[in-house]
């Protein structure tokens, strides 16, 4: 006979516990689940006493401090307070399983979606927490409903909220593949063909030929005039998987979208994510975001409709200041020979049965080198299987993860060595456009820093976890070290970078020249893996000096105004959108390129009420930033001339951009890395422009700046010009220069003569891996070829020239010395023809 113990407690009703700390004591936990950690208890207590009535709250805990349990306890507390239903959202299905396992371990009741069922009744009745993944909630055909047809929720919690926000943006985006959706791709391509030719004929030809890296933005005025045709094309194909889930969100909001076209896909994405379309989230009584301590949360202001106050004032445990052990190693600082290729080659050769090694790379292209060396390359379909293999102890080969910096946990032996390979790459065309247009933007650089920090954190998942992190790739090293961008990292990461620089210097001092530099790098890793007491004490003492001295930023206010302006525009309140954007420009923007970016938004807001005024504003935007949309009329080419110029003073002016020699050297290393075959055209041409300025020439990119003319144009003393046509993306196995490429070169030579006259002195170069001109092709002018070896020779001489500058301050660097160094390294204008180029060979039939 079962005894009714509750009856013995007289007639009192036992109210469920609402204090999450007390609640934890009542749970039927498994024996492996011990007491709450101090950090968990501190955060839970503070939430219960001070924050539990707030609508919006960000909770920040160190990795490994148990934020999953904290989140589950908060939701159970709210359920016990009759403030359900409560929803726990993970960034992917893989992490749903992990959270469910945690809930089982701690005895917290939960429910999940069955394969074919609707929303569980246990969730709707406020009985159990519903654990699901972000794609299930945020899509145009969400089971939770959209707009006014949403399912009521009491509390929504986003776990790993930074990973979730990217997925939410993708929910509003249609991405149409050229290969799998050729019909829709072709129709949209044809629809905007004439408009895109006006924006840049060369780029449009590259897109038509299927170039992956080239992309263009459809002008907002063309999008507006042809939106009905776009809707017809999309509506007819709405059942296609690439359109199906986003279509309900787009179909009545098409004017608030922008279209980007590349050689491989078309992307239609919103200027601003309308999170209010998902009422289950936007109308929830409480919205809780879980975030790591190293992450910058400012983007929640625009992306999730949070107030700046909520973002600036998270709930966090102030002690300890840091968690886990990260040995950051920058091999190129140990020795120049420890470059990207050497590290990849050496570490792909290493075989170990004791721990896992991971490489995080930014693109599919970056995977190829690892693949050729026998590494395991993960795909979207295989990634979690490969991660499980690592956790089971299968450490046979290095595992490569492509462009995924979040939502991955690799604790303990599953990852003891992490290679962070090259600067993260934005996959979305909208993000790539903003990065290209505003490379110095605080917003863009914060997002890049955030991706890097997410990557760094993959291998250290707890207080006692440790991992060696190798940082390779000149652009990435520069971003992490440079004064201009290092400030965008958290205090924790900045300190770890400082430690990395210091141990590289220590290694240099103890470096035995008979030893291979890469062995020095490996010996550093061994010290950490073998738990060297000196290293552990040094790391701990350095990290304990950590001070969070972040300065106040205007980024919150800027993101708020961006969001408000877009909301006004989408509601048809054009005047308020215009005044909000004008205020943002006047009060918060200093940099001219960024001012141009915001002027373009202002021109777009003005377009519905005054086309003429919109064109004038777009002209102003384009003059400040030539990476933006070319206005429909009124842009003239500005010729370059060396009159009143002094080459040596120009070189000094270039050097003055940098606060010290180290900053200059970092910048030049990154530029020279981009001046390589295989680099995407935009980066290569930008690097060549920078090299022209470094060498004291007037340097221009006509094709980018006015959509006509050569890729690069330099002007030197006595108005001697160097004209460059760049083909950095041409395969190195290509046997000949095509008739089309020769014709393109001829057109650009003709443009130059039209602008500068037939008597202008100029050398004309094509940078391409082959010197053989197709029999069908012909050049109308004398053209010289720069191939790999000549390009490498030029880069070596530039690097040598910059190294020679190290002992000098600007004041000490005389004209004579500077001129001698330029001559020594063959960097005068006549050297380009004589030293770094060769004649082409015209193939016979």
What would you call each of these model-derived segments?
Residues 389-478, 730-731, 765, 769:
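Conserved RecA-like P-loop NTPase helicase motor core
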Residues 364-367, 383-389, 394, 422, ...:
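Catalytic core segments in nucleotide and nucleic-acid processing enzymes
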Residues 2-60:
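Conserved pre-motif I regulatory segment
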Residues 618-621, 625-679:
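Interdomain/boundary linker segments immediately adjacent to catalytic/signaling cores
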Residues 65-114, 136-139, 294-299, 360-367:
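Conserved Walker A/P-loop ATP-binding site and its immediately adjacent core
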Residues 97-98, 103-148, 385-390:
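Inter-Walker segment of RecA-like/P-loop motor cores
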Residues 56-58, 62, 152-155, 160-339, ...:
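Conserved coupling segment at the C-terminus of the helicase ATP-binding
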Residues 68, 138-151, 159, 164, ...:
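SF2 helicase motor core recognition
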């Amino acid at each position: 006979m079962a005894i009714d113990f509750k009856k013995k407690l007289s007639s009192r009703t036992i109210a469920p516990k609402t204090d999450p700390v007390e609640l934890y004591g009542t749970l039927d936990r498994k024996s492996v689940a011990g007491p709450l950690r101090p950090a968990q208890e501190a955060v839970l207590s503070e939430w219960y006493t001070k924050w539990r009535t707030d609508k919006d709250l960000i909770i920040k805990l160190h990795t490994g401090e148990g934020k999953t349990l904290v989140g589950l306890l908060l939701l159970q507390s709210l359920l016990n307070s009759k403030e359900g239903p409560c929803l726990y959202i993970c960034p992917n299905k893989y992490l749903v399983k992990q959270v469910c396992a945690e809930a089982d371990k701690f005895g917290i009741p939960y429910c999940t979606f069955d394969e074919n069922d609707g929303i569980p009744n246990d969730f709707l009745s406020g009985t159990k927490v519903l654990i699901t993944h972000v794609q299930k909630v945020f899509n145009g055909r969400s089971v939770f409903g959209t707009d006014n047809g949403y399912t009521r929720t009491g509390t929504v919690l986003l776990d790993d909220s930074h990973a979730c926000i990217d997925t939410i943006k993708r929910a509003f985006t249609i991405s149409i593949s050229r290969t799998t959706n050729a019909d829709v791709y072709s129709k949209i391509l044809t629809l905007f063909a004439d408009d895109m030719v006006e924006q840049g004929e060369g780029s449009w030809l590259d897109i038509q030929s299927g170039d992956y890296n080239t992309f263009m933005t459809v002008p907002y005025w063309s999008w507006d005039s042809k939106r009905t045709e776009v809707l017809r094309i999309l509506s007819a194909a709405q059942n296609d998987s690439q359109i199906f889930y986003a279509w309900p969100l787009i179909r009545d909001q098409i004017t608030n979208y922008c279209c980007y076209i590349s050689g491989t896909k078309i992307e239609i994405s919103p200027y601003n994510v309308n999170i209010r379309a998902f009422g289950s989230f936007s109308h929830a009584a409480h919205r809780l975001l879980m975030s790591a301590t190293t992450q910058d949360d400012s983007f929640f202001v625009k992306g999730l409709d949070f107030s700046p106050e909520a973002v600036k004032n998270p709930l966090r445990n102030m002690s300890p200041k840091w968690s886990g052990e990260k040995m950051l190693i920058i091999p190129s600082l140990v020795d120049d020979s420890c470059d990207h290729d050497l590290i990849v080659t050496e570490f792909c050769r290493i075989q170990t049965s004791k721990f896992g090694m991971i490489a995080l790379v930014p693109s599919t292209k970056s995977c190829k080198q690892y693949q050729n060396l026998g590494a395991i390359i993960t795909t979207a379909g295989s990634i979690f299987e490969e991660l499980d293999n690592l956790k089971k102890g299968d450490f046979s080969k290095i595992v490569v993860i492509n462009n995924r910096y979040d939502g991955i946990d690799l604790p303990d032996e599953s990852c003891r060595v992490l290679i962070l390979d090259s600067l993260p790459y934005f996959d979305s065309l909208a993000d790539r456009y903003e990065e290209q247009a505003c490379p110095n933007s605080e917003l863009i650089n914060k997002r890049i820093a955030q991706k890097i920090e997410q990557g760094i954190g993959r291998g250290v998942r707890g207080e006692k976890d440790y991992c060696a992190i190798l940082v390779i790739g000149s652009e990435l090293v520069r971003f992490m070290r440079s004064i201009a961008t290092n400030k965008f990292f958290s205090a924790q990461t900045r300190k770890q970078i400082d430690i990395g620089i210091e141990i590289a210097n220590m290694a240099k001092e103890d470096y035995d020249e008979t030893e291979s530099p890469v062995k020095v790098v490996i010996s550093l890793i061994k010290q950490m893996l073998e738990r060297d007491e000196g290293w552990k004490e040094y790391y701990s003492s350095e990290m304990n000096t950590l001070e969070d001295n972040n300065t106040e930023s205007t980024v919150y206010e800027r993101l708020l105004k961006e969001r408000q302006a877009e909301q006004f525009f989408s509601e048809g309140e054009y005047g308020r959108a215009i005044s909000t954007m004008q205020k943002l420009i006047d009060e918060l923007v200093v940099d001219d390129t960024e001012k141009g970016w915001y002027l373009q938004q202002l021109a777009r807001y003005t377009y519905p009420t005054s086309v003429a005024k919109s064109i004038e504003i777009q002209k102003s935007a384009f003059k400040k930033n030539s990476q933006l949309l070319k206005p429909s009329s009124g842009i003239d080419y500005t010729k370059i001339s060396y009159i009143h110029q002094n080459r040596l003073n120009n070189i000094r002016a270039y050097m003055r951009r940098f606060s010290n020699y180290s900053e200059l050297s970092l910048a030049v290393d990154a530029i020279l890395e981009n001046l390589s075959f295989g680099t995407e055209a935009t980066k290569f041409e930008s690097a060549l422009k920078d090299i022209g300025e470094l060498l004291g020439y007037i340097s221009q990119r006509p094709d980018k700046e006015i959509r006509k003319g050569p890729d690069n144009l330099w002007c030197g003393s006595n108005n001697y010009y160097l004209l460059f046509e760049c083909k950095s993306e041409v395969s190195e196995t290509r046997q000949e220069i095509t008739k089309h490429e020769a014709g393109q070169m001829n057109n650009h030579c003709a443009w130059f003569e039209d602008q500068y006259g037939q008597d202008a002195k100029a050398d004309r170069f094509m940078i391409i891996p082959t010197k053989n001109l197709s029999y069908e092709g012909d050049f109308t002018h004398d053209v010289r070829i720069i191939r790999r070896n000549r390009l490498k020779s030029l880069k070596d001489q530039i690097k040598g020239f910059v190294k020679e500058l190290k002992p000098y301050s600007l004041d000490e660097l005389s004209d004579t010395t500077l001129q001698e160094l330029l001559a020594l390294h063959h960097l005068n204008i006549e050297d380009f023809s004589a030293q770094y180029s060769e004649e082409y060979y015209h193939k016979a039939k």
